[in-house]
Amino acid sequence: VKFFSQYVPGNERVITIEDTMEIRYSVTNPGKDCIEMRVNDRFDYADAIKTSLRLNPKWIMLSEARSKEVKYLLEGWSTGVRGMTALHTDDVRNIPDRILNMLETRVDADRLENDIYQAMDVGVLIRKKKNEAGQVYRYIDQVCFFDREGQKNKIIMAVTDGKLVLKEFPESLL
């Protein structure tokens, strides 16, 4: 999230929501329009996301989606607000299922499944490796695009095992 945040245009309002201040958007992107929110026991992620939607953001960046707050994040993104978050999974193709499993009820999951493919554009899987000197480095292992064309949800792989596999971008993604 922190790395990709540098590509957000400076005139677009960004709201970051974190429990520990890791993104530090205003420090890494000085002069850009930003409101940083910190959640705690009295002001949780769901409260912060709902509050942020009243502040006319172009972007909502959540440090990590872990639980039921993903429902409010998806609802926010489905209004046209863009966003970024991190979540733990072993394959980008599992992102939709991972999100559905975070939702509190089956009704929420059924209602929001299509929103995942409409509101999310890209999934990126970052892995860690050690080089011969023992230094840890991160690399992009997988990239996919989420799309909803007609009544069908699609995952289009662009990078697999760190290699570009998509030769031509589908028209629906441009």
Where are these regions (language model features)?
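Active-site donor-binding loop signature of nucleotide-sugar glycosyltransferases
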Residues: 37-39, 89, 128, 145-148
